[in-house]
From Swiss-Prot:
This is Alpha-glucan water dikinase, chloroplastic. Residues 1-85 form a transit peptide. Belongs to the PEP-utilizing enzyme family. Acts as an overall regulator of starch mobilization. Required for starch degradation, suggesting that the phosphate content of starch regulates its degradability. Homodimer. Induction: Down-regulated upon carbohydrate starvation. InterPro entries: ATP_grasp_subdomain_1, CWD_DUF7067, GWD-like_N_Ig, GWD1_pHisD, PPDK_AMP/ATP-bd. The N-terminal domain contains the alpha-glucan binding site, the central domain the pyrophosphate/phosphate carrier histidine, and the C-terminal domain the ATP binding site. It is found in: Plastid, Chloroplast. The gene is R1. The reaction takes place in three steps, mediated by a phosphocarrier histidine residue located on the surface of the central domain. The two first partial reactions are catalyzed at an active site located on the C-terminal domain, and the third partial reaction is catalyzed at an active site located on the N-terminal domain. For catalytic turnover, the central domain swivels from the concave surface of the C-terminal domain to that of the N-terminal domain.
Amino acid sequence: MSNSIGRNVLHQSLLCSTVFEHQSNRHSSGIPANSLFQAVSINQPAGASAARKSPLSTKFYGTSLNARPKMAMGRHRPVLITPRAVLAVDSASELAGKFNLEGNVELQITVGAPTPGSLTQVNIEISYSSNSLLLHWGAIRDKKEKWVLPSRPPDGTKILKNRALRTPFVSSGSKSLVKLEIDDPAIEAVEFLILDEAQNKWFKNNGANFHVKLPSERSLIQNVSVPEDLVQTQAYLRWERKGKQIYTPEQEKEEYEAARTELLEEIVRGTSVEDLRAKLTNKNDRQEIKESSSHGTKNAIPDDLVQIQSYIRWERAGKPNYSADQQLREFEEARKELQSELEKGISLDEIWKKITKGEIQTKVSDQLKTKKYFRTERIQRKQRDFMQILNKHVAEPTEKKNISVEPKALTPVELFVGATEEQEGDSILNKKIYKLAGKELLVLVHKPGGKTKIHLATDGKEPLILHWALSKKAGEWLAPPPSVLPAGSVLLSGSVETTFTTSSLADLPYQVQSIEIEIEEEGYVGMPSVLQSGGNWIKNKGSDFYVDFSYESKQVQQDFGDGKGTAKALLEKIAGLEIEAQKSFMHRFNIAADLIQEAKEAGELGFAGILVWMRFMATRQLIWNKNYNVKPREISKAQDRLTDLLQNVYISNPEYREIVRMILSTVGRGGEGDVGQRIRDEILVIQRNNNCKGGMMEEWHQKLHNNTSPDDVIICQALIDYIKSDFDISAYWKTLNDNGITKERLLSYDRAIHSEPNFRRDQKDGLLRDLGNYMRTLKAVHSGADLESAITNCLGYRSEGQGFMVGVQINPIPNLPSGFPELLQFVSEHVEDRNVEALLEGLLEARQEIRPLLCKHNDRLKDLLFLDIALESSVRTAIEKGYEELNEAGPEKIMYFVSLILENLALSLDDNEDLIYCLKGWSNALSMSKSKSDNWALFAKSVLDRTRLALAGKADWYQKVLQPSAEYLGTLLSVDKWAVDIFTEEMIRAGSAAALSLLLNRLDPVLRKTASLGSWQVISPVEVFGYVAVVDELLAVQDKSYDQPTILLARRVKGEEEIPHGTVAVLTADMPDVLSHVSVRARNCKVCFATCFDPNILADLQSNEGKMLHLKPTSADIAYSVVEGSELQDSSSANLKEEDGPSSSVALVKKQFAGRYAITSDEFTGELVGAKSRNIAYLKGKVPSWIGIPTSVALPFGVFEKVLSDDINQAVAEKLQILKQKLGEEDHSALREIRETVLQMKAPNQLVQELKTEMKSSGMPWPGDEGEQRWEQAWMAIKKVWASKWNERAFFSTRRVKLDHEYLCMAVLVQEIINADYAFVIHTTNPSSGDSSEIYAEVVKGLGETLVGAYPGRALSFVCKKNDLKSPRVLGYPSKPIGLFIRRSIIFRSDSNGEDLEGYAGAGLYDSVPMDEAEKVVLDYSSDHLITDGHFQQSILSSIARAGCEIEELFGSAQDIEGVVRDGKIYVVQTRPQM
């Protein structure tokens, strides 16, 4: 570079200050610039668009959409360029600036000026050495404050949210250096800050960015510029050359600036602008010819007018996301519409007036300045590990919490009440207890035999006088007739004074002071009174006491229930304080704050009680204000106190966070002093500034002064809507009524609002401005969970004072995540979008960003909590608004939305482990779908099923924890019954779970169709006739006996129920495993059993309740029809004959004790053990070595009876005999008592010794070697197996087939538990199709009890042809959320003589009990090799199928086999003939 050029460039080098990006305008360097699409005609005459002055800026700010040559580009919002101070530098030097920073740190910047085509170098050196020193920087281009990211950042540079770069300094001794190379001639300056990340320390230029102006090639040609239409044309040609790709916003910007750079370089090389225009225009000859026919007329319409029309079309269409081609078409369609108007003779002036009527001009202008249309902006979500948001904070189980539900100690007055009520019988009319300075006053009214009798009693010790009268109408004081005066009364003028006397009722340990008044005369309606004690008058809160004779209190008749499942004492305390709480929000919030510690001691149910109370308040079920004036600042202070205590609980007790969040959502944020006072002051300023001091505004002012409430937020919004609708009063009432405020409610306020608003047109602008500002003040106190208010509180704001009105300054929350304010800005700008995908992503990214801050103490924690609650709620609102967007969406988009809502739900729960694994499952399903995996829909269906189970579990939690408190407290507070009944339902609807459930319902049929699953899964295909009966759950009717063939439609089937007698079919929406107990019994008993996935089919079946249906199943479907006429009688008798047949041949043979307490597997015979033990012994030594058989011993038949007859168990035997007699008298409660009694048996020494010997000789561990306690555990497990003979399911099953229950004998098979990776059940003939050439199997993770027991969800299921065992085919992926895992242990299996009888399905009726309790583990299938590794899956499933074939071949018949997989090896633990 020559010295002259260098000096010239360096003379122009500027080092300037700009506002630091996080504090700058909305689209400064922290936020991606928004753009719009506008049409520009390349060869448009200069004056063509000047025919009408545009309401929009015609200056070009970035890229645009060309109508010709059709290039889609963006446009930046114009920003105010702040004046910059110039730093003078030595013209002969490349030193651009030198600074002394805080702490004697020196910063030096040098710039190397380029020659044409070379790089510009910026060297930044700081006398500060740190391994964590970063340059936070970006570049300025085209005089815009918005940062761009240069294409050649130094090594190690990271991109921060596509908004800034962070480059590490290189340490050199005591200094640190960074060298930047800029190759884009359009870049005019570099801006930066320096950050010591480890210290969180920023180095700034007097609080702003350092700004280094760069020398540029453009400085050599200052008098030459490139016309924007040529840049647009060049950008289009680049776009066309690259195949008309759809660009992201960032790519659009880069392409546009690259086009500009190319043209600038041409000019530097000496090409004139005219030559460039000719060159570019020639390249567009083809397009010119194509469009020549309409070119002249198109150019007659200003492009900015076309732009407005295209925006209106886009908004009318629901703001869809358009592709590049669609954008072009839309723009041309808008031009055609306008051209059509012109051809009708309408002038451009008239079109301008028409389409810019009302607010459309401002609205479009704002939209074009700040937003893209045709394409929604997106934030770049960070890649996160879902496990980072895992919560496992589980509240202590209610039953373990020391919550007393015993009746509290009764006061003397309550004891008096009880005794009096018992004495007087059912004639009680009215009862009330008043609180008097720590004592109680009872008033009890009853009418025995037509008389009116009043009892008054108090536990006060001081002498007390009742000053009273009677009344025949309200408010009257009449002297009573002398005949009714109690002894010792003094008759005065118009009243009586009677002294309370000490009295005691029988069996009452306390004395009380009481009065009894008896009135025989009719006509009196009540008794007014006051009390006198020690010369002082005592009133009822300033009024007379009044006893109503005619009012029959509902509370006297109300059954309050026993308060079970609630923090009963706390709820009763709340109910007792409600009279005080009704005075004002200040009273209510202070009372709630006083109760927080008591709620904490009561645990989860305590906070549930507070939540229910606050929810009743928020839904206007409780009185907000009654005869009490309170200043707004007093309300906000009380809110502040309550929310401070709640935030402390949130930190100290993470297990209650979910409930605390819900409580906070019902309470405003509050605030000390000024925030609340502003409500009172600002309304006066609004009235004064806008000259509206009378009418409705004055009435509202009086209400605000005396008792502001959340209703005021709605009233303010209603006024704004009224003004915006051009003073349409119906808009005012619509907003009020939509939010639950009626005329009656307005009139019910202590300071009633009688009038409607009536403003003048000249007040419009001022009122909209001032009421809009006032809304922020109201929301700051009352609407903590309002999104706009919550964002404002977090980012800070300042409202200036005016005269007497105080100012308010809320500081920004410190240490927010980098870029977080811009993220909130994005959310604010897009919150009204109809296409909600980008908004949902922004809301969830914001929640993820602040989550770490919510887990630690922070002085502004509650502001962050209210923000998080608002963001969570906005997700729900957005998805409800976005349902329309999903109408035509494919499964991938619906799955993505499901994952977003699921993430939102997981971020709010105390225990979200199950949801996290569902979330990971959806992520896998999306990946499989995008990669076109064969089984993606099948896998996604399993994740959907599991997600539904998780939602059902959450609903059960609400029902268990909240509903009992709602019912008990609702009864105590006389809340409307409908509000109590739907309490849980409304709480669920208020969260994301309901929206998620709706999306799952929409996705389910899509997945079933894609995976070819159909509407049914037929578990037992039996053709039947039967009458339809609808039940909630099969368990509730398993003991019932139907006297006609019945088709049960059961909402819930767990899997271990018994099928009721007389049932010919069970149809359910639930999903029991195909090989669960109930499924096996259905097949064995020839009962049709199927799951229906289609709610419409289920609804149709339910509509036929009471009618007879004919079910005709195939292996994959069920056809059904209503049976009518003569067919009805024939089908009924056919069913009954079929049902009565087989049971008569079933019989049991009584087994005897054979003299041995324990035997080894070599000694297993039919006389000693059941088929389960014999079959496992038969396999030993016969199966291939790759199939393991566990070592077994047994306690044979007769041991139970022998132990019971031992002298040490005489008392147990006698008690059992009595209970059996009770059972014989049809008292089925004896079954439970029998089981409990069996567990009291003691083990004879001989049994212990024999069992020990046989187990050790077989190589099994003896529990007693680990201590006596371990043997006791084993003995208890043995007794539980014996006791299961009397479980309800087994007892009714044997009785149904007329088996003699006394003949049923129970051996116990003892096996060592194999700590399994997986458990499986095989049916060697496919049970659904009956295909003997095909094996069907189910596999679960962990122990097999989750497969055969009542554990929700489905197992992995597969089939495999016996002639192709290496090719298993997966039918369904697992959805079971829980796996059971156990330490090395012993299992004691039931082995009765009644399990495998021909014609009787006895398998699975009795219990197998492990010595140790299995651990429940929430399963993560995304890390399970059986699901994710195709080769491993094929290997394991093939081995299971091969084992099934081997065992079937050994027995020569179809088998029902149970086994486990451990470290890839197959173990078979039992087998029986497949029935």
